[in-house]
C-alpha cells in the first residue's frame, strides 16, 4: 500500500496543532483533560494559574477544535474532542521521559 503525501491543508492543520501544544500551559491543560472534563476554575486551580490566563489559553484551543465545551447552568465544562488528540498529548509527554 502506497501512502500519499499530506495535503497542504492537512499540513497547515497539523502545524497549528503542534504550535498550540508547544506552550507549557496549553500542554498542561490538554494533559489534565485526558482524564475527563473540567471547568476553567478547576483547571486554573490544578495548574495554580489565574482563571483569566487559563481562559485565554482555552479560547485558543477551542478555536483550533482542540477542546470542546459543554454548558451546564452558568458553568462551562471543557474536554478533549477525541482520542487522537489524547494520544498525541500522551505520546509527546512519553517522548519527554
PLM region spans:
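Residues within the DNA-recognition helix of helix-turn-helix
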Residues: 57
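N-terminal helix-turn-helix DNA-binding core of bacterial DNA-binding proteins
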Residues: 12-52, 76-84
